[in-house]
Amino acid sequence: MDQPDAQQYPHGGVPPVTPAAIGRLAAVGGVGFLVASLASDLVIGPFPGPDTPPAQLVSFYAAHHAQVGTGGLVLAVSGVFFVLFGLAVWARIRQASASPLLAGLAMIATALAAVTTLISAGTYGVLGDVGALHGVDAAALQAWHIMGSDGSLADSFSTFLFLLAMAGAGVLARALPRWLAWTAMPLAVLQLVPNQFGFLASLLFLVWTAAAGISLLFGRRDRQADRTAYAVREEVRHA
């Protein structure tokens, strides 16, 4: 196996991450986050609202506790994919020599969004475990159910902060395509809107993440192809 040239990395450090590797990581993370999140919803299935009477919740979890717990596990996997996507964006911002504050904001927002996702996944896991037990207090079950069925402010704010960082990365640092930055701005605001609009915004965020990952993958390839074609034309012209 060929070894890297020592002169290429004179300081003996790890070779820098290539734009192609960043694009692949972003695509895997973004698309994986979308697929795993939707799969979690499909596994859990129709979920009772937060105002469901306790008696109905007891019968619901007695019949569906296994799929709720499995859905929580799949949701945890989506959080891992989101971390991969956030790392790719962070690396892209660093390569663009943008402000360290912007790169730090992207990492903080990624960590917050991942933590809130894992907390939600853990809540579904607890519901799946206690739902199978006999004699569970209905009021306690309802309290856990409300935590799982009603999105928290922490979820919305972490997504808002992440999208705000993405907007800055595209507009200020030009580390991301401009269309991603401009669409991130209104989508960030919608994350803080309550009720159905906020829920719709959370679904759009899943699609936005997958589209961003694919854009970072193929957009970089297109620019590399353009530079290669330009270099070939210059060589032919000077031949």
Regions found by a protein language model. Give the residues of each.
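Hydrophobic, aromatic-enriched alpha-helical segments typical of multi-pass transmembrane helices
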Residues: 2-239
